[in-house]
Amino acid sequence: MNSRYVGYICCALAMIGVGSTVVVSKSIAAGLPPFSATALRFAIAFPLFVLVMRWRGVRWPRLDRRDTALVIAQAAAGSVGYTVLLISGMKLASAGDAGVIAGTLPAVSAMVAMLALGERPSPALLGAIVLATAGVLACTVYAGDNAAPHAGGSIVGNLLVFAAIVCEALFILLNRKLRTPVAPLPLSASMCGIGFAVSIVPACFEQAWNMPIDAAALGGVLYYALVPTVAGFVLWYEGAARVSGAEAGLMTALVPVSALALAALLLREPVSAAQLTGVACVLGAVMLATFGQSLGARKMA
C-alpha cells in the first residue's frame, strides 16, 4: 500500500480513538471519581510508554529548572486538568455535545495563543475561531427537546468539557515555550508519569476503594489508557511522518464526527439538529485553521 495512504489510515484511526474518549468517559464518570480515574489511566499508560521508549532506544530529556517547571505545568493542565474536567463534564453533558466541543481544539489553541502571547491571527484563523464558537453555542444554547429536562446540567457539563479543551490548548502553548525541544515520545511518557504524581493525592481523598466495583468504568479506563493514549500516540506520529502537516491537521475533523457517530451507535443518544449544525461549524473551523496555518508557513518560507 502507498505510504501516504498508510499515513492517512494511521492518522484517521488515531483521531477516531480521540473521538471515542468522550463516549468512554461517559461510562467512566458513572462509576469512578474523576481524579481516581485519571490516576488509574496514567498508572496503566506510563509503564507502557517506558517500554516503547526502551524498544526505540529513546532517552529521557535533560531539562533545566525552567523547562522542568513548564513540563510539570503541562502535565497538570493538559493531562490531569483535561482528563478530570472531561470526566466531570461527561456526568452532565451528552457525548454528542462533548464530541462537537472537543473538535474545537485547533481554533481554541489559536485563540489562547492570541490572548496569551499577543499573536496576530490570520483572517483564516479568526474565521476558525468564530466558527468554533458558533459550533459550541449551537450545542450549548440551542439544546434539543430531549435535553430540556436537564438543560441546566447540560450547559454546565458543556462548559466543563470546553474547559478541558482550554487545558489542552494550554498544554500546546506551554510546549511552545520550552527552551529545549522534547521529542513526542518522552514528552508523552513524562506527561503520564507526572500526571500520575499530580492526580494520586486528590484521588486518595476521593476514597474510590470504598465504592462498589464498576466493571464498565474500569474497562473504560483500561481502554482510555491503551487505545487513545498509547496506541493513539503511536498511530498519530506514525501517520504524521508519512503525510503533510496540513493533511494531518485535517484528520482532526474526524474527532467530532466519530464522537457523534459513536454516541449514537453505542450510547443510543439521539442526534439533534443543533449537534449537526455544531459539527458543520467545527468542521469548517478545522479546515480554516489548518489551511490558515499552512498558508502562514508558506508565506514565512
Per-region residue spans from a language model:
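Membrane-interface interhelical linkers
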Residues: M1-I16, F46-Q74, I87, L92, ...
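Hydrophobic residues within alpha-helical transmembrane segments
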Residues: I9, L13, A39-I44, A69, ...
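Hydrophobic residues within membrane-embedded alpha-helical segments of Major Facilitator Superfamily
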Residues: C10-L13, G17, V22-V24, A77-G81, ...
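Helix-helix packing/entry segments at the starts of transmembrane helices
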Residues: C11, T38-L40, S79, T83, ...
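Intracellular helix-loop hinge segments at the cytoplasmic ends of transmembrane helices
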Residues: V23-S27, I87-K91, A110, A132, ...
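Transmembrane alpha-helices of multi-pass small-molecule transport proteins
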Residues: G31-G81, V108-V112, V166-L174, S188-Q207, ...
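Structural signature of hydrophobic alpha-helical transmembrane segments
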Residues: P33-P47, S88-P106, S154-V166, A215-T229, ...
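Hydrophobic transmembrane alpha-helices of multi-pass small-molecule transport proteins
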Residues: F49, V112, P121-G144, G193, ...
